[in-house]
């Protein structure tokens, strides 16, 4: 729901706007934590290490994406504050077009560099194959990570920080359920963890 941040108490507006944002970011970090916790129940040290290293890489990439997406929030918020609907629409359209291209390029680059990235992370030999499998699947899901963050940035620019929180909360619940399915029932190991994460991120966009 769009919230008018230009009226009422400044501190109250900041608090009610920032709290859902902080919770959203916290929930986003739970993806890797949930993968680690669940794989530890079904796999050995190699599988757990693979997910641990893969989660670190994905967290770094997510932080970069979130940082880039913040520019969208600022641009749209300025246009909304100025009551310039055309500029707000223009910013939204340009952002979607730009990041659509960026997501595909970034996905291809990361897929080509997946093995060097695993080596740079000083991955133990026994965990290399699992880490490569985990990151390969997660990298395929990069467009959905970018899409979620861009959509969330647009909502926040419009003054709505609650909707992105609801999106990611549903995705986190789905991730946990899918992790137990893929790792517990189907015994897919690190690949199962990555599948759960990627599919739940897709759900957060849909």
Residue spans for each PLM region:
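Residue-level signal for short hydrophobic patches within transmembrane helices
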Residues: 7, 11-30, 34, 57-64, ...
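Interfacial/gating helices of multi-pass transporter permease domains
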Residues: 39-59, 125-130, 190-195
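Transmembrane alpha-helix boundary and packing residues in multipass membrane permease domains
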Residues: 21, 25, 37, 74, ...
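Alpha-helical transmembrane segments of multi-pass membrane transporters/permeases
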Residues: 99, 154-177, 195-198
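Short alpha-helical transmembrane segments in multi-pass integral membrane proteins
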Residues: 1-18, 76-141, 185-206
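Hydrophobic transmembrane alpha-helices of multi-pass small-molecule transporters
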Residues: 60-63, 107, 175-179, 205
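Helix-loop interface residues and adjacent transmembrane-helix termini in multi-pass membrane transporters
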Residues: 30-33, 41-45, 79-82, 157-158, ...
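Small-residue-rich hydrophobic transmembrane alpha-helices
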Residues: 48-108, 145-164
């Amino acid at each position: 729901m769009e919230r008018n941040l230009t009226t009422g108490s400044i501190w109250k507006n900041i608090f009610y706007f920032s709290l859902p944002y902080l919770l959203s970011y916290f929930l986003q970090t739970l993806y890797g934590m949930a993968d680690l916790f669940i794989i530890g129940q079904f796999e050995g040290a190699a599988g757990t290490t693979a997910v641990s290293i893969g989660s670190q890489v994905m967290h770094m990439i997510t932080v970069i994406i979130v940082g880039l997406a913040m520019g969208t929030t600022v641009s749209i918020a300025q246009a909304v504050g100025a009551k310039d609907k055309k500029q707000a629409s223009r910013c939204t359209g340009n952002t979607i077009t730009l990041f659509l291209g960026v997501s595909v390029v970034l996905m291809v680059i990361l897929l080509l560099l997946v093995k060097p990235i695993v080596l740079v992370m000083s991955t133990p030999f026994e965990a290399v194959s699992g880490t490569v499998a985990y990151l390969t699947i997660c990298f395929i899901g990069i467009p959905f990570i970018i899409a979620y963050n861009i959509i969330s940035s647009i909502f926040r620019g419009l003054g709505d920080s609650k909707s992105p929180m609801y999106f990611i909360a549903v995705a986190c619940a789905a991730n946990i359920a899918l992790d137990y399915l893929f790792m517990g029932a189907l015994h897919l190991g690190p690949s199962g963890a990555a599948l759960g994460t990627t599919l739940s991120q897709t759900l957060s966009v849909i």
